[in-house]
């Protein structure tokens, strides 16, 4: 692996130190920004790219049938389309957190297909892995 995402996005006081010692390229558990950025530890640049996450881009809270947050898949699709459109206008990354046991159901797959269909109508979009995104960010920021 070249990156790390903490389970449930929970960090301990030691997480960043451990991730750095492991030599990872990126970390993806923090919500400090909408744009990728370089993590700093104790005032020192780490060379580690943060690919930020956000609750609105996580399928689990939106499809939680045990809580009061369950949404219709087509409504979730529209939320994600709106989130994508603003990210596209701003020229930044759009990254969903998806769980196969959450978004892998038929009606939710239809919503995901609708989102992908919408995304592919926009110019200048590329689908990539977190590794590819982190390498792109490093190159753009002169971190290599």
Regions found by a protein language model. Give the residues of each.
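C-terminal domain-boundary segment and adjacent tail
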Residues: 26, 74-144
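Active-site-adjacent pocket scaffolds in enzyme catalytic domains
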Residues: 2-90
């Amino acid at each position: 692996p070249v990156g790390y995402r903490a389970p449930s996005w929970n960090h301990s006081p030691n997480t960043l130190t451990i991730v750095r010692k492991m030599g990872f390229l990126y970390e993806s558990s923090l919500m400090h920004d909408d744009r990728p950025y370089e993590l700093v530890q104790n005032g020192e640049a780490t060379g580690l790219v943060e690919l930020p996450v956000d609750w609105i881009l996580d399928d689990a809270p939106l499809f939680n049938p045990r809580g009061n947050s369950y949404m219709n898949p087509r409504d979730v699709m529209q939320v994600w389309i709106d989130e994508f459109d603003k990210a596209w206008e701003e020229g930044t990354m759009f990254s969903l957190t998806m769980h196969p046991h959450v978004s892998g159901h038929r009606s939710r797959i239809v919503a995901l297909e609708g989102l992908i269909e919408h995304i592919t109508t926009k110019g200048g979009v590329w689908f990539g892995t977190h590794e590819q995104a982190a390498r792109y960010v490093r190159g753009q920021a002169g971190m290599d």
